[in-house]
């Protein structure tokens, strides 16, 4: 991401461009690959690295798939578009999936490549703020109505904290040592530090808000009617994520090609940061999920008033059925560099 663009172009996530194409044909046809689409929730970045790696390193092709990855943007409705059959697969976060299901969207999570959410609150080192309880006497920029924003408001006293809308830029942060803002640890901190700031990240996961991020989702109908196709997509994506976490360089070059605003330095920074978020503390296969995590998130969204009790069912939000349980934890592999 070039300097000026980087300064102004970092924004909220959950978006997309309109596109077409739904899954078609039986999975596994060897002579002709099955064409499917994958809708991202944002412009291509490291949070999508494993899916691009599956393409770059041929894992989709080996599985008999021809995957078109469709970039997102500021107004995407990934869950709704996947549930409606406009796209075969999508990438979203767990809170957005539950919100979609609450509105009747029949979509389900298949793979959670990141164990820890990258969401953070970025503060200046000079502010003396070392933990969330220290957030006082500051301006705090957050997206109004976001799940994490509502959680923070309920969880913390936020004494003398002036909450303002997040505008997608780190410029105000750079101008005021008493300014804090939402961030993804692999994005905004790099921009701020490149522009001379010394930052500290307070991870939302450490406060207990840790929705699965970069989820691979599909229509529930596809899971029932095309399980072989879904299995191929999930396992190829698992391989892609393992490869990206081990060797991000080739995929970062592809990411830079499809999103020229991201330069290779920020992508290398992001790949290193995201590696720390991968893994699986549940003891299951990489990318696996637990009902306890989904139930915790569901209850948090009920507590903040964003969901009604009984409006969603955590056990129906995901399945680990299609994962390759023989794969090792990708974060435990030694990195071969950029």
Residue map of PLM features:
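Bacterial N-terminal signal peptides
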Residues: 1-9
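Compositionally biased, proline/threonine/alanine/serine-rich low-complexity intrinsically disordered stretches
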Residues: 6, 19-30, 328-338
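Bacterial signal peptide processing site
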Residues: 11-16
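Short, glycine-/small- and polar/acidic-enriched structural segments
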Residues: 20-166, 172-186, 202
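Short linear loop/turn motifs
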Residues: 68, 76, 206, 269-275, ...
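Pocket-lining segment of extracytoplasmic ligand-binding domains
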Residues: 95, 168-261
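Secondary-structure end/capping motifs
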Residues: 225-307
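Conserved C-terminal helix/tail region of periplasmic/extracytoplasmic solute-binding proteins
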Residues: 295-338
């Amino acid at each position: 991401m070039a300097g000026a663009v980087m300064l102004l172009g970092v924004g909220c996530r959950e978006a997309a461009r309109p596109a077409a194409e739904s899954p078609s044909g039986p999975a596994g046809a060897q002579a002709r690959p099955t064409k499917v689409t994958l809708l991202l929730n944002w412009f291509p970045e490291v949070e999508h690295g494993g899916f691009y790696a599956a393409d770059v390193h041929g894992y989709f092709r080996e599985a008999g798939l021809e995957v078109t990855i469709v970039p997102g943007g500021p107004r995407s409705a990934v869950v709704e578009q996947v549930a409606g059959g406009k796209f075969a697969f999508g990438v979203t976060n767990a809170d957005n999936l539950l919100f979609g299901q609450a509105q009747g969207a029949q979509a389900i999570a298949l793979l959670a490549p990141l164990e820890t959410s990258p969401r953070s609150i970025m503060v200046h080192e000079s502010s003396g703020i070392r933990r969330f309880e220290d957030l006082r006497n500051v301006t705090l920029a957050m997206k109004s109505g976001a799940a994490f924003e509502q959680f923070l408001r309920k969880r913390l006293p936020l004494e003398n904290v002036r909450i303002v809308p997040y505008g997608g830029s780190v410029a105000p942060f750079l101008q005021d040592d008493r300014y804090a803002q939402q961030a993804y640890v692999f994005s905004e901190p790099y921009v701020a530090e490149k522009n001379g700031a010394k930052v500290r990240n307070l991870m939302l996961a450490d406060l207990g808000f840790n929705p699965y991020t970069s989820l691979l989702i599909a229509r529930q109908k596809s899971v029932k009617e095309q399980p072989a196709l879904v299995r191929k997509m999930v396992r190829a994506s698992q391989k892609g994520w393992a490869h990206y976490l081990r060797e991000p360089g080739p995929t970062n070059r592809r990411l830079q090609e499809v999103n020229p605003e991201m330069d290779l330095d920020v992508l290398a920074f992001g790949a290193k940061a995201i590696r720390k978020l991968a893994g699986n503390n549940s003891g299951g296969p990489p990318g696996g999920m637990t009902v306890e995590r989904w139930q915790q998130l569901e209850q948090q969204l009920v507590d903040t008033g964003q969901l009604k009790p009984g409006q969603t069912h955590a056990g129906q939000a995901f399945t680990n059925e299609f994962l390759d349980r023989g794969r090792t934890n990708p974060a435990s592999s030694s990195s071969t560099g950029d």
